[in-house]
Amino acid sequence: MQTLEEHCWSCSCTRGRDKKGTRLSTWLAQRAAKAMSSLNSLLSLAYHTLASSEGRSLIRRSLVLFAVGVFLALVLNLLQIQRNVTLFPEEVIATIFSSAWWVPPCCGTAAAVVGLLYPCIDSHLGEPHKFKREWASVMRCIAVFVGINHASAKLDFANNVQLSLTLAALSLGLWWTFDRSRSGLGLGITIAFLATLITQFLVYNGVYQYTSPDFLYIRSWLPCIFFSGGVTVGNIGRQLAMGSSEKTHSD
């Protein structure tokens, strides 16, 4: 009799476990089906977005901005390595790739994000441009930006305060000459703060090193370079967006 009761109890427990296992399997299957359905919807949306003219334009602008960021990172790195070097000997040219390999791709990615962000914020705020943009103005902005970086590497200043004030004045002059928008000023300051913070964190942890060992010197010019770089890349992104919109309307 006791054996029969134990057998019945074990059978009921087994059936209970089977029911729980069945419910759990059913619930997991339903969740998996919902997840697959959501994934298919996202993939379909991404495909249709990329297949559209706006999606193709976004990809083209991203690639151009990435290439510009990588190129500027290599050129500006060479200018910093070249401090107090007047000629271009082979050993100096070879040092253009002496930086960490991940720096140019990171700069390219940052340039793509910033360049796409500027026209989006302009469109969201509805802020009108102060003047008509053209590629000649954008090229002059790039030249001034490279000149500011070159000045920070070549010119000798009495102290860090003088260096900071000079580069800050040049950076604000670049913004006033080629931008003059509140969104450009705000984004430039935000980019300068965040990029300087991230860079100093990498230097502090030994992930990245500068050619100059003077930490105070580096800290004094770095925010100005990031600010002017953000304004420059933003102007490139705006010009690319304007060209893409004009081409879309003409089509």
Swiss-Prot record:
| GO MF annotation terms | oxysterol binding
Annotated positions for site Required for the recognition of 25-hydroxycholesterol: 145
- Residue ranges in the Cytoplasmic topological domain are 1-58, 119-133, 179-183, 238-251
Segments on the Extracellular side according to the record's topology features = 82-100, 157-159, 206-219
The record's Gene Ontology cellular component field reads: endoplasmic reticulum membrane
Keyword Metal-binding in the entry? The reply is no
Subcellular localization, per the record? Endoplasmic reticulum membrane
Name the keywords, alphabetized: Cholesterol metabolism, Endoplasmic reticulum, Lipid metabolism, Lipid-binding, Membrane, Steroid metabolism, Sterol metabolism, Transmembrane, Transmembrane helix
Q: Where is this motif: KxHxx?
A: 245-251
Instruction: Indicate where this protein is primarily found.
Output: endoplasmic reticulum
Q: Which GO terms describe its biological process?
A: cholesterol metabolic process
- The source's superkingdom equals Eukaryota
Q: How does this protein sit in the membrane?
A: Multi-pass membrane protein
Enumerate the InterPro entries for this protein: INSIG_fam
Q: Does the keyword Magnesium apply?
A: no
Residue stretches spanning the membrane = 59-81, 101-118, 134-156, 160-178, 184-205, 220-237
What is the annotated quaternary arrangement, including any partners?
Interacts with scap; interaction is direct and only takes place in the presence of sterols; it prevents interaction between scap and the coat protein complex II (COPII). Associates with the SCAP-SREBP complex; association is mediated via its interaction with scap and only takes place in the presence of sterols.
What's this protein's family per the entry? Answer: Belongs to the INSIG family.
What's the stated role of this polypeptide? Oxysterol-binding protein that mediates feedback control of cholesterol synthesis by controlling both endoplasmic reticulum to Golgi transport of scap and degradation of hmgcr. Acts as a negative regulator of cholesterol biosynthesis by mediating the retention of the SCAP-SREBP complex in the endoplasmic reticulum, thereby blocking the processing of sterol regulatory element-binding proteins (SREBPs). Binds oxysterol, including 25-hydroxycholesterol, regulating interaction with scap and retention of the SCAP-SREBP complex in the endoplasmic reticulum.
UniProt free text on domains = The KxHxx motif mediates association with the coatomer complex.
- Please state what the protein is called: Insulin-induced gene 1 protein
Per the UniProt record, the lineage of the source organism begins with: Eukaryota, Metazoa, Chordata, Craniata, Vertebrata
